[in-house]
UniProtKB/Swiss-Prot annotation:
Keywords: Cell membrane, Membrane, Transmembrane, Transmembrane helix. It is found in: Cell membrane. This is Uncharacterized protein YjiH. GO terms for cellular component: plasma membrane. The lineage of its organism: Bacteria, Pseudomonadati, Pseudomonadota, Gammaproteobacteria, Enterobacterales.
């Protein structure tokens, strides 16, 4: 599996990328980064969360509103509605990534970001778009990572390390500046400091798992080779 992932990474790293590919890569980073989410101008359309939108609310008693999932659900039926709620963001993100790939953006990501992500996390640069997406949306990044794994562009080891990065503080920007607003007035430091701490420990957590995997691979060389 490792040899297959390295072979694919090598092909992407040596394949020539035109200006169109680099432009697609940078535009996709901007799209998933959330930099335009707070503006009221027309360029809000270049933000993932804006295009993803939101479901309407159903009117209830006494002026209250609920989502289409309703309230008090349980079991498989409520789980089905929850999964249905996640579908639009996953479909949209995978569609954007397919367009980016068709324009050569993933090859550009591999060539530009591998020298950065390999030392930091031990994963190839092709993961960079999912890494950026994870800052704003949990499901989009997970879907993109699954697609990379299924296409053999990342190894099982890469997937495990990357999942550790994503699980810790997932959708940090969206959650921090929505739910976190309630405690901003009580912070004894700058608003950006807790955000930076969370981001740093996303990398710390992934590297702790990375060290553990290295230890296990040295202890069981045959098992590490199969991964």
């Amino acid at each position: 599996m490792t040899q297959q992932g390295d072979a694919v990474a090598g092909e992407l790293a040596t394949e020539k990328v035109g200006i169109k590919g680099y432009l697609a890569f940078f535009l996709t980073i901007i799209f998933f980064s959330g930099v335009f989410s707070g503006t009221d101008s027309w360029w809000r359309v270049f933000d993932f969360s804006v295009l993803n939108g939101s479901f309407g609310q159903l009117p209830g008693a006494n002026g209250a509103t609920t989502s289409f999932r309703g309230a008090g659900g349980a079991g498989a039926k409520d789980g089905f509605l929850f999964a249905l709620e996640l579908a639009p963001s996953v479909i949209l993100s995978l569609g954007i990534i397919s367009i980016t790939d068709g324009l050569g953006g993933l090859r550009a990501a591999q060539q530009l970001m591998t020298p950065v992500l390999k030392p930091l996390l031990g994963i190839p640069g092709i993961c960079s778009l999912a890494l950026i997406a994870n800052l704003q949306n949990t499901d989009a990044a997970a879907g993109m990572t699954k697609e990379l794994a299924q296409e053999g562009e990342i190894t099982e080891r890469d997937k495990v390390i990357f999942a550790a990065y994503q699980t810790s503080g997932s959708a940090i920007i969206t959650n921090y500046f929505s739910s976190g607003v309630a405690v901003f007035a009580f912070l004894g430091t700058s608003v950006i400091v807790p955000l930076a701490v969370i981001l740093v420990f996303k990398f710390v957590g992934a590297n702790i798992l990375r060290v553990w995997l290295n230890f296990e691979e040295r202890r069981n060389p045959t098992q590490g080779a199969q991964a």
